A protein has these predicted regions:
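N-terminal cap/lid subdomain of alpha/beta-hydrolase-fold enzymes
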Residues: 27-45, 86-180, 464
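A catalytic-pocket lid/entrance helix-loop region that shapes and gates access to the active site
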Residues: 131-134, 229-321
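Alpha/beta-hydrolase active-site loop
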Residues: 154-157, 164, 181-200
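Alpha/beta-hydrolase fold nucleophile elbow
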Residues: 204-216
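Glycine-rich nucleophile elbow surrounding the catalytic serine of serine-hydrolase chemistry
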Residues: 213-226
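Short alpha-helix in the alpha/beta-hydrolase fold that links the catalytic acid
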Residues: 223, 441, 455-465
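Alpha/beta-hydrolase fold catalytic core
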Residues: 306-453
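Catalytic histidine-centered segment of alpha/beta-hydrolase-like enzymes
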Residues: 483-492
């Protein structure tokens, strides 16, 4: 399973603690409790750990948007899932934000993070929700606070953020029941069922339905959309993917085969251009051309010798910032060597999640860069405690259950073969079918330039090899400054929100 080490923001980590973070309460205007929904009274609690779950909480709020004040209803609660024998198999936690309008055709977007094993707090408090986590000066999770989100997607779509079983406050009914959900197809089926339940119970059949997923959540989005069509009779209008894993063979072969390395190189070069202050899309386009021509040919062919080897490795070193001797030693397959060798002697370690992000190396004496990631295991952990405080203090959902922001045990137990899959997971065929079967279906894929976990060039390669009839606006790639969670940069978040809005405005 080593090739999945960097699958998403959910790998190689334990459950996050639920300490309450400091926050502002400016977004609580109009946020008084309005009681519990009928669904919450029906589905609260349950056996074992599920007894810690309270009834659904419904609160009313307002937020300022570019179009003026927006009143909305927030629901924090759970859906019950049942097995074939009619026994309760799981409780699925969700957070819904619904504008108080009388328009029955307002879009609704179903949102989840990745992992497998990541909760939805990242996208909730990081990008789309009405409240957002602010980290102050720099990336310091010790000072996180909540503020109104000026770029909330609630301005143009209702939102339903879902935590898969084992993440957030979603739990299997039995302690050993997770295996019933922790597989590619089983996961997609359970998420599709939750979406179908929400649509039915909230009379959203007439609403255009979109899916937003990050990292493995992008892969999940394609699988869920197909299950919705085939098993639930629900046809999604589109998918938006943030830093998605689409083709595992390409995305995790950067140190194994030539094409994988070639699709990694532009992200490494993007980070070096950022460090030099010379980043432009035009400069990066030159790297992309080199990556799929001279670089790919050199790595795929016999080992270079003599002057040709020196010239080639020197060029790669200049593009990436790595010392030439390191590039030569690795014969151009440089991703894994990158994190510990970028600046020999400075004792820094670089993040795979954002190659521009580096911190002091906690183990400079070790040759390998494996271990905690500066970005993944750093400030972003504060999203967990921030969400616990948000749910308790503003949404009225109070529980002593641990909020699982990132669950490493799920990733380790995931069944990649589930549902007739292959050892290298792929969602490209699902996207082809979705685009072919629904002529109005829209796909937007968003990436950060300096993400080494899910390099943007992989998605470009996949889109370039889609059938000709889906080219253009129906399937598009958008790129932003930053890494895997590029939305932690306010300017990139604002730009992506504006781009995403065009999907919803399309006829």
């Amino acid at each position: 399973m080593r090739r999945f080490r960097f699958f998403t923001i959910a790998l190689a980590i334990a459950l996050v603690a639920t300490a309450v973070a400091a926050q502002e309460h400016s977004g609580r205007s109009g946020g008084e409790r309005s009681g519990h929904g009928e669904q919450g009274r029906q589905e609260q609690g349950g056996p074992g750990v599920l007894s810690l779950l309270p009834t659904d909480s419904v609160t009313e709020h307002t937020i300022g948007t570019a179009a003026g004040k927006l009143a909305y209803t927030a629901t924090a609660g759970t859906f019950a899932l049942f097995d074939q024998s009619g026994e309760r198999s799981a409780a699925i936690f969700y957070t819904a934000f619904v504008a108080r309008s009388a328009n029955p055709t307002r879009p609704v977007t179903f949102v989840f993070n990745g992992g497998p094993g990541a909760g939805s707090a990242f996208l909730n408090l990081g990008m789309v929700g009405p409240r957002i986590a602010a980290f102050g000066n720099g990336f310091d999770g010790s000072s996180v606070r909540l503020v109104d989100n000026p770029d909330t997607w609630l301005a143009f779509t209702d939102l339903v953020l879902i935590d898969p079983v084992g993440t957030g406050w979603s739990r299997p009914a039995k302690p050993d029941g997770g295996s019933s959900f922790w597989g590619v197809h089983r996961d997609a089926e359970s998420m599709a069922k939750v979406i179908a339940l929400y649509v039915a119970k909230n009379s959203r059949v007439s609403s255009p339905k979109y899916i937003l997923g990050e990292s493995y959540g992008g892969f999940r989005a394609a699988k869920v959309a197909r299950v919705l069509q085939t098993s639930q009779g629900i046809v999604p209008s589109g998918i938006l993917m943030v830093s998605p894993m689409i083709e595992g063979h390409f995305q995790f072969g950067g140190d194994q085969f030539a094409l994988g390395a070639a699709l990694q190189l532009p992200s490494l070069a993007a980070a070096e251009l950022e460090r030099k202050g010379t980043f432009t899309p035009a400069a990066l386009a030159q790297v992309e051309h080199f990556a799929l021509t001279d670089y790919l040919a050199a790595l795929a062919g016999p080992p270079l010798r003599g002057d040709a080897a020196h010239a080639f490795y020197a060029r790669v070193a200049q593009m990436t910032g790595l010392p030439e001797d390191v590039v030569t030693r690795e014969r151009g397959f440089i991703r894994d060597a990158y994190v510990k060798n970028l600046r020999p002697g400075d004792h820094k370690i670089v993040s795979h999640y954002d190659a521009t992000f580096a911190v002091d190396d906690p183990n400079p004496e070790q040759a390998s860069g494996r271990g905690p990631d500066p970005f993944l295991d750093g400030f972003i952990r504060a999203y967990g405690s921030a969400f616990v405080a948000y749910a308790r203090d503003e949404l009225g959902f109070k529980t002593d259950m641990t909020y699982n922001l990132l669950a490493s045990d799920i990733s380790g137990k995931w069944d990649w073969e589930d549902g007739g899959g292959h050892s290298q997971p792929s969602a490209a065929e699902d996207l082809r079918q979705l685009l072919a079967l629904t002529p109005s279906f829209r796909l937007m894929i968003a990436h950060g330039y300096s993400d080494l976990v899910t390099p943007f060039a992989v998605s470009r390669y996949i889109l370039n090899h889609m059938p000709p009839n889906v080219e253009g606006e129906r399937a598009e790639l958008r790129l932003y400054r930053g890494g895997h969670m590029f939305y932690t940069d306010p300017q990139s978040r604002k730009a992506f929100t504006a781009d995403a809005r065009t999907i919803y405005a399309a006829p």
